Amino acid sequence: MSNRKQARLEAKQFIDTLSVQPYPNSTKVYVEGSRSDIRVPMREISLADSLVGGTKEAPIFQPNEAVRVYDTSGVYTDPTHQIDLYNGLPKLREEWIAERADTEVLDDVSSVYTKERLEDETLDELRYGNLPRIRRAKAGYCVTQLHYARKGIITPEMEYIALRENMGRAKYQDEVLTQQHAGQSFGANLPKEITPEFVRREVAEGRAIIPSNINHPESEPMIIGRNFLVKVNANIGNSSVTSSIEEEVEKLVWSTRWGGDTVMDLSTGRNIHETREWILRNSPVPIGTVPMYQALEKVNGVAENLTWEVMRDTLIEQAEQGVDYFTIHAGLLLRYIPMTAKRVTGIVSRGGSIIAKWCLAHHQESFLYTHFREICEICAKYDVALSLGDGLRPGSIADANDEAQFAELRTLGELTKIAWEYDVQVIIEGPGHVPMHMIKENMDEQLKHCHEAPFYTLGPLTTDIAPGYDHITSGIGAAMIGWYGCAMLCYVTPKEHLGLPNKEDVKTGLITYKLAAHAADLAKGHPGAQVRDNALSKARFEFRWQDQFNLSLDPDTARAFHDETLPQESGKVAHFCSMCGPKFCSMKISQEVREYAKGQQGEAGQAIEVKLLDDPLEGMKQKSAEFKASGSELYHPAVSHEEVAEG
C-alpha cells in the first residue's frame, strides 16, 4: 500500500473510531454565566499533595490547588459527550443567534457554485450529510459583534469570553501560585479582571474581534486583541498533490487538542468546498480561509482569468458555510509591485502573487481593492471578520521592513477604516521574515497606521538558515512580537518551506507557538499568566513528577522523555532525574538546606548567613564532627515520598 493510501486509511479510521480523550489527570469543568446556556469550558489539572514535614511514620501533607488552563479542545476532551463527526458538534450559539431576531433562515443557498456542487450526484459519497440551514441578516440589519458592541449591547458571546479569559484565577488562595513579575506591556491595557463590559468596549473600539459567523454556531466564542491572552492559529488544508478530507478533519481535531485558538483551512486541491464543510461542522474554534485560493481553482489556476463575479460568489459560498474570517489581499496596489523588483525573494505570499499577476495582466487595481466596499457588505450580512492580508510581506530577512511592505501596511490601515464604516471586524496580517532588532518597528508601524486593529503575524522568522527548524526560528520572533502587542500568532511547522505538514508537524508547530504566546503573556505581565509556571516549578522542586508532566504544554512528550532513562514506576517518585542522578541534584540539596534552616529556627538565607559570620572556626569544627558521626557520607536522603511509602 502506498504511503498516501495508508495515511488516508489511518485518518478514516481516526474519524470512524474517534472517542473522547481527556488530558492526563485533567477534568473538563464548565463555568456558568448569567444564563444556563453560557457554560465556559476550562481544563482543570489536579495535583498531588505536597509533603511538608513529619516522619516516615507520621508524614504531614499539604494539598495543592488544582490549576485551570485555557481549553480549545471543545467536546473532544469531555467524557460526558458522545463524539460523532458525521453529525457534527453541538450548536452552542444557535439559540443566541436566533433570539436576536435579526437574521432569517434561507430557503436555498445563494451561491451559484454551491448549487452546482449540491446537484452533482458524484459528490454524494464525499459530501457532509447533515447540512445545516443557512442564515443571513434580514434586510437593513447588521449582525456583527462589532455592530452590537457599538450599540452598547453585551452579547452572550462577550460574557462567555470574559469568563474564558479570566480562567477562574480569582479562586486561587496559594500565594506561591499567584505571585507574578510586573512585566512590560508596551501600552497594553491589562485589567486584573476581564469583565463583559471590557470585552464590549474593546470590540467597539476595534482593538479586538470576536470571529463568529452566524453560520458557524458550533464555535466556542473567543477573542483576538492585544489586551487579551495572545492567541495562536494553526494552518491545515489539502493541496493538489497530497491529503484528503479525512486527513484534514483529523488535523482539525488534533489542532484543537494542542491549543489552536483558530484554524485556517488553506486547501488548494480537489473538493475544497466539501472539505471545508466537514471542517466547519466539527470545529469548536473559528475557521479562516483565503477565498482567493478557491476562486483560482474555479478558473483552472489562471490568475488573469479571475473576475469579481467569481470572487463574489466564492465569498458568499464560504460565508454561508460558516467561515469566520477571510484573508483578503486588498492592500496590494499596482504601484507597489515595482517596489519588489530589487528584493531578494520578491513576492512570497501566494495570495499576493496571484493579485500581482492579475494587476500586471490587466494594468489596473485589483478587484479586491475596487470592490472592497461590496466585500464589506457581504461580511456584514454573516459576521465574517476581515483579515487584511499582507501580500507584500518579506520572504527573507534581507527584504524586511522595506518600502513595499510598509506601503501596503498603510493601505491596510485605510481599508480598516472603510470596513469599520460597515461595522465589519478587522485584523491586520503581518510578516514574515524579520531579524530580531527590526521586529518592534513592525508593531509600532502597525499600531500607528492601522488604528490599533489587532495584529496577526506569521512568526516572524528571525533567520533564514534553518529549513526543518523554522518552527524555532519563527517561534523566537513570535514571542517577541507577541510581547510588543501582536494579538495572534500564526504557527509555523518544521515543514515550512519544505512540504505540507502532517499530524505530528501540526502538533510540533502548535506546542512551539503556545510556548511563544505564553512567554509573551508573561513578559507583558498579563494577570494570572504565571500561575501555571509557579505550579510546575513548585512540583519540580518537590519532585512531583506526574504533576510536572501534567502541567506541561505537552504531557505526553514530557513523560516519554523522562521514561527513556527512568522507565520504572519508582522513577516517578524519585528525588532526582537522570540528568544529575541522586547525589548531585541541586533541588534535593536545596531541600536539605531548608531542613537545616528549620533546625536553626530561621529562614534558609539567615541560617547560612549566621553560620558564616558567627565564629567561623567553631562552626567548621561542629560541622566536621557531624560529618564524621554520620558516616562521612556526602549526601543524606531527606524525608521523601518513597520513604513514606516504604514506611
From Swiss-Prot:
Pfam families: ThiC-associated, ThiC_Rad_SAM. It comes from the Bacteria. Belongs to the ThiC family. One of its GO terms (cellular component) is cytosol. Binds 1 [4Fe-4S] cluster per subunit. The cluster is coordinated with 3 cysteines and an exchangeable S-adenosyl-L-methionine. One of its GO terms (molecular function) is carbon-carbon lyase activity. Its cofactor is [4Fe-4S] cluster. Pathway: Cofactor biosynthesis; thiamine diphosphate biosynthesis. Keywords: 4Fe-4S, Iron, Iron-sulfur, Lyase, Metal-binding, S-adenosyl-L-methionine, Thiamine biosynthesis, Zinc. This is Phosphomethylpyrimidine synthase. It comes from Vibrio vulnificus (strain YJ016). Substrate binds at N235, M264, Y293, H329, S349, R350, G351, D390, G391, L392, R393, E429, Y456. InterPro entries: ThiC, ThiC-associated_dom, ThiC/Bza_core_dom, ThiC/BzaA/B. Its EC number is 4.1.99.17.
